[in-house]
């Protein structure tokens, strides 16, 4: 041991300067410990309820980076390099892991081998540094949740980046409500939240439905401007990864212009505690809008929903809310004012809790489709009772009816809801289906569908093109292919399906079915999907 403070013991097998040791003490005592335990979050200290107290061990070594955890029920600590002693965010994040580890061995949240809660360890460890005054406007990677809200909450794809619900829980309840997710015994953070709050499952579902509605303008008590400034507003599509903030509906049948009935997309319908935000356009002069909602209950899915309408100001900085709606069938009439943007928010809240484990196969997770019938309003894509005009530089393509540049060959199929933007192109017998967007790259063969976005645009980190060739099948639902690294492609007989995170510079896979985290070492998976492709039928 080379130094000791009120709450920490410092160790090193190297010569550490007194200045560096004093910096370590100052940071860990006055920033980390103070904000986690003495004020702000008021988390219960490790060993607070034990007769024997052990100071966390801080191991400093030049080859260490920044990590934390423990090695016994009464031993927690951190392993850090000298350069990390100035990193307040990193130290808070990692010491949060040490705290989580202690609770896992002392009656709190514990992850089974199936791993139902590994994601929240990282998400919570990004939530805690955001509470430090110096980081109140630092949102880190949390934009991911708002860019792909249809994925289940707790997805492995954004496991560091989905902590906004903890911020809202802190607002609505108190900081201890977040702490109790970890201090309550149980294997799943959501059931721990329910248990610690004394809620029924219906009340837990209410919380997530209410939270989703407030995410339209990030209507939180604490630092909402930080979220709004970093994310931009919900309608922004200036970057390819922001093109799925709003979920466009599809016509339920050919009579949509008269019956005004629409359905959520097969791939875009929300998973458990995921949500859709749908832009609605009130008819000119309308004083109210009516929504008839009909949820789709697939056998075994235990479908249930929370939904409502949200009207915002033109700056997307304040909102009015309808009452939260529940169940498979409900009708809502809501007052509207001229000039107010209007949104339908639908959250998947199954009536029987659905456990999802880390990296669970995409096709084994329920997606909760729903239908709506509208009065005095049209959804995005169908304004004023007709299909919306195509984006600049594109027109309706004769083969399929979607939007594409005029140079697109007639042999290319572009489905009615698909788009080829001017930065992308397709040729040969390529098929662009469903809600797919070709933003930056080429498709010379195969099929691109689902919610796939091909190529990155508008990015400060590089606008990477992505290419699809051969007979590849690409139907993805997460971030744009090409977002993470450059020079990537899908070729041959490759089948990319669902929540794909395609990783590795120059990656070009040519065979097998893959979903989830996909790199050069990924195992081939099954594309089987439990969700029915049958078009739902309206019910009165």
Describe each model-derived feature in a short phrase.
Residues 23, 27, 31, 86, ...:
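Extracytoplasmic/secreted proteins, especially bacterial periplasmic and envelope-associated proteins
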Residues 1-75, 79-95, 99-103, 288-292, ...:
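Zn2+-dependent metallopeptidase catalytic core
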Residues 378-439:
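Extended, small-residue-rich solenoid/repeat segments and analogous flexible loops
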Residues 37-59, 107-118, 137-143, 176-184:
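Surface-exposed patches in mature extracellular/periplasmic domains of secreted proteins
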